[in-house]
């Protein structure tokens, strides 16, 4: 039954990224994302939140009904700690790429981080138009963000400077990427 529910709530999607060693400020890097830092964090006491196992039918995933609460409770501290390593605060972020793992996942990430609906609009857009595609979902969010940045620049407006992308892994883990727009 669990696998049938999971197949019903997950969508299909594919994403790829080209990562290069272009120097910030170079013409090739302009208008693209630069990875400043990455950080993985395991939320204490959430081992039942997302569990994966391999069986004769393939990969099986079990999601705890408490997963959204784990995210709400833990994301604020995780993000503050990660940004603090770079002398940054949430208010310094121009964009947020929240893994669109479902309505409750986005809502509770917003609640835990004190973000508005507007700040999570890209994640809501991807969830609404594509659903939760698991791993590639946050890449779709980043594509929307980069497209909006390029549109703003084309109109002579200030583009985006920096933001944070994150998704969730078994454990429950949070995997974050601090991004600068070149």
Question: For each predicted feature, which ranges?
Answer:
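Claisen-condensing/thiolase-fold acyl-transfer catalytic domains that form or cleave C-C bonds
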Residues: 72, 76, 90, 94-182
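Amphipathic, alpha-helical segments enriched in basic
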Residues: 50, 54-58, 63, 84, ...
């Amino acid at each position: 039954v669990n696998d049938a529910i999971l197949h019903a709530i997950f969508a299909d999607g594919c994403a790829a990224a080209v990562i290069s060693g272009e120097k910030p400020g170079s013409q090739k890097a302009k208008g693209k994302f630069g990875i400043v830092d990455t950080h993985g964090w395991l939320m204490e006491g959430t081992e039942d939140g997302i569990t994966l196992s391999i069986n004769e039918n393939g990969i099986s995933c079990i999601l705890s009904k408490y997963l959204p609460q784990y995210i709400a409770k833990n994301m604020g501290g995780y993000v503050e700690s990660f940004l603090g390593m770079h002398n940054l605060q949430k208010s310094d972020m121009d964009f947020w790429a929240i893994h669109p793992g479902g309505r409750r996942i986005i809502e509770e990430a917003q609640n835990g981080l004190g973000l508005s609906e507007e700040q999570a609009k890209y994640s809501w857009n991807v969830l609404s138009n594509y659903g939760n595609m698991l791993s590639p979902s946050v890449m779709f969010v980043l594509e929307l963000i980069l497209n909006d940045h390029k549109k703003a620049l084309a109109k002579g407006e200030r583009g985006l400077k920096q933001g944070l992308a994150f998704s969730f892994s078994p454990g429950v883990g949070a995997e974050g990427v601090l991004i600068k727009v070149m």
